[in-house]
Amino acid sequence: MRILFVAAECAPFAKVGGMGDVVGSLPKVLKALGHDVRIFMPYYGFLNSKLDIPAEPIWWGYAMFNHFAVYETQLPGSDVPLYLMGHPAFDPHRIYSGEDEDWRFTFFANGAAEFSWNYWKPQVIHCHDWHTGMIPVWMHQSPDISTVFTIHNLAYQGPWRWKLEKITWCPWYMQGDSTMAAALLYADRVNTVSPTYAQQIQTPTYGEKLEGLLSFISGKLSGILNGIDVDSYNPATDTRIVANCDRDTLDKRLNNKLALQKEMGLEVNPDRFLIGFVARLVEQKGIDLLLQILDRFLSYSDAQFVVLGTGERYYETQLWELATRYPGRMSTYLMYDEGLSRRIYAGSDAFLVPSRFEPCGITQMLALRYGSVPIVRRTGGLVDTVFHHDPRHAEGNGYCFDRYEPLDLYTCLVRAWESYQYQPQWQKLQQRGMAVDLSWKQSAIAYEQLYAEAIGLPIDVLQEA
């Protein structure tokens, strides 16, 4: 199949969230399965310093009264072509830059559509999140190009009807209430990044006011769990960690813990229970819940806690103050550093993901890969990847709690801390986590089926739904 990925992010060049990881990883696996896969994304001003292969101009197009150029390079470590849409609108040195995002990404989506009509015609356009939401609308009249739309985070829905009509000149009945809603209506197939999240977003609690529409199109809605790049994230070969190891050489992992304690200014002690937290410091990631119990947990236990991330100033201040109250026990780095995040995965005993909602989540999978036991709230993709430890039957790979309540999180942390004292059992738990297949292989096969279904659908998806 000829498949074109269209997205605002693509790792390792431009990444803010999990979408960048998907777009940077899945095409490689699909290419290995024999498909002609290509990627289309904006040519941001900061990309030149990151390109291994210089981008060469190959085509000039016209969209929404603006000329643009398309440049070609390659995704690193593969022969997947990467097309970059060049225009002054994408010159800012960050991906998301404020008030003009609605116009910028609608223009980008229109450019991708023009490229597909006039230069390289795919059988399937795989659209990602609201930035590409108008593509299924425009492709509605192209019977030989089908569309698949992936929801990475339903909370971000793009410009709403009044602004969308002004930007695109499409009549309101061809749009829905936002670019996200437009894509849900017109895409041949819609999927989320985990099976559980696909079910949850059809309810008022998680539906972000689109639960009615999502229930209506449930016949073409599915969930496919994300994978991770197991070649890049490999504790046996990762050059950014101190000691390489795998589940058969778990004793070497202690060197990573001791090095992390030293790097983060903690007491260097192999017996301390070290918990890692790497996330955006926003409510979605459960930081408000964590702050309600962290002081109490640290005063009750002898555990250590490390935080890496940036976000809302209020949460940053609270974490910083806690770190000053527990010197040698807690360390807060208000930044993002890819190398340090890997060292936290490799050196922590447990990894906390207490999300309010989580479409898929990648950090818990990276923690499993590196031997850090995840402690998670059962929601979205966390339900599909982390299973509660059952010592009696030697099952499970982490610790889970259900309700978004301080007591539930506190109890789960205490239970994990107490279990850590029994090292033979804890090491078996780590080994079970490291044995989980987290690669893209099974997910890629599921996407193959999704593309095949999209191509076989009647073009009038409203009647099909």
UniProtKB/Swiss-Prot annotation:
* Biological role stated in the UniProt entry: Synthesizes alpha-1,4-glucan chains using ADP-glucose.
Q: Which residues bind ADP-alpha-D-glucose?
A: 15
Q: Name one GO molecular function term.
A: alpha-1,4-glucan glucosyltransferase (UDP-glucose donor) activity
Q: What NCBIfam families has UniProt attached to this entry? A: glgA, PRK00654.1-3
Q: Which GO terms describe its biological process?
A: glycogen biosynthetic process
What keywords tag this UniProt record? Answer: Glycogen biosynthesis, Glycosyltransferase, Transferase
Q: Which CDD domains match?
A: GT5_Glycogen_synthase_DULL1-like (cd03791)
| EC code | 2.4.1.21
Q: What is this protein called?
A: Glycogen synthase
Q: In which pathway does it act?
A: Glycan biosynthesis; glycogen biosynthesis
One of the Pfam families matching this protein, by short name: Glycos_transf_1
4Fe-4S keyword on record: no
Q: Which family does it belong to?
A: Belongs to the glycosyltransferase 1 family. Bacterial/plant glycogen synthase subfamily.
Gene name, Swiss-Prot/TrEMBL:
glgA
Name the catalysed reactions: [(1->4)-alpha-D-glucosyl](n) + ADP-alpha-D-glucose = [(1->4)-alpha-D-glucosyl](n+1) + ADP + H(+)
List the InterPro entries hit by this protein, alphabetically: Glyco_trans_1, GS/SS, Starch_synth_cat_dom
Extract the PANTHER family matched here. Answer: ALPHA AMYLASE DOMAIN-CONTAINING PROTEIN, GRANULE-BOUND STARCH SYNTHASE 1, CHLOROPLASTIC/AMYLOPLASTIC
User: Which Gene3D superfamilies does the record associate with it?
Assistant: Glycogen Phosphorylase B (3.40.50.2000)
Please give the organism: Synechococcus sp. (strain ATCC 27144 / PCC 6301 / SAUG 1402/1)
